[in-house]
Amino acid sequence: MIDAPALDTAEFQAKLDTTDLGRNLLAHFSIPSTMDVAREVAADGAPHGTLVFAEEQTAGRGRRGRSFYSPASQNLYFTFVLRLPLAVHRRLPVILPLAVARAIREHGLDARIKWPNDIWIHDRKVC
C-alpha cells in the first residue's frame, strides 16, 4: 500500500496563517481513520493543533460511530488534536460550523448551516 499523500505538506504549511493549527502535520494516503490516528498521537503527546490528514479512510466513522464512506481523493479527511480548556470544548460544536461557513463565504460561495454542524452549498452537503 502506498502511503504518500498527494498533499504537498511544505506548500500547505507555508500558506498557513496560524501559529499552531496544522503546524504539526501528519499526512497519509490511506489510513483506517484520522480520528483513531489522532487519538493515538494525542496519547503519545502530540502538540495542540496537530493535524492528521488522509487521502482515504478505510474505516472512517461519523457521529455516534456510524460508518463513514471515505473514497480516495474525493474529499478532505482530517482530524485535529486540540488541547483546549473544557469550557472551550463545549462551545466547539457551535463555533466550528460558523467559522467554516464564514470561510467558505469569503470565497464567494453561499454556505448555509444545517444545525447542528452540517454545511450546505447549493443544496448539497459539503461537510
Regions found by a protein language model. Give the residues of each.
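N-terminal lobe of the biotin/lipoate ligase/transferase fold
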Residues: M1-L109, V126-C127
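Glycine- and Gly-Pro-enriched alpha-helical subdomains that act as flexible
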Residues: I113-I121
